[in-house]
Amino acid sequence: MIYDTISDMLTRIRNAYLVKHETVYVLNTKINRKISEILKKEGYIESVNLSTNSLQKLEITLKYLGNQKKPGITNLKRLSWPGLRFYSNYKDIPPVLNGMGVVILSTSKGIMTDREARANKVGGELLCSIW
């Protein structure tokens, strides 16, 4: 039984990049779907689809750069987990690599990036950082 589906998804993506897989399958939950859509919108992964053989899986196609297949994501880091939650208002959201990376937040207006949260002037729980 997986209790933290976000950490499981991030770990599966990280491990798939390490062994240079083209696709990775993760649990199909609302929060995983929204985070993977943000990763696609920000250009870190190629595509997100529902798995054809199972309705409980998301199929994420990973993005590689250049002929040497360099990963599209350098680092994925879980910031808040079930045992220790981190919250921030919109003024105190930490920048990742001086704005080069992205922090994903869970706010009262849904899951969004740090830039969207600052623009909407809304804070929330810091879920993960990507660069």
Curated annotation (Swiss-Prot):
The gene is rps8. One of its GO terms (cellular component) is ribonucleoprotein complex. It is found in: Plastid, Chloroplast. Belongs to the universal ribosomal protein uS8 family. InterPro entries: Ribosomal_uS8, Ribosomal_uS8_CS, Ribosomal_uS8_sf. It comes from the Eukaryota. One of its GO terms (molecular function) is rRNA binding. It comes from Tupiella akineta (Green alga). Part of the 30S ribosomal subunit. One of the primary rRNA binding proteins, it binds directly to 16S rRNA central domain where it helps coordinate assembly of the platform of the 30S subunit. Keywords: Chloroplast, Plastid, Ribonucleoprotein, Ribosomal protein, RNA-binding, rRNA-binding. The lineage of its organism: Eukaryota, Viridiplantae, Chlorophyta, Ulvophyceae, OUU clade. HAMAP family: Ribosomal_uS8_B. This is Small ribosomal subunit protein uS8c. GO terms for biological process: translation.
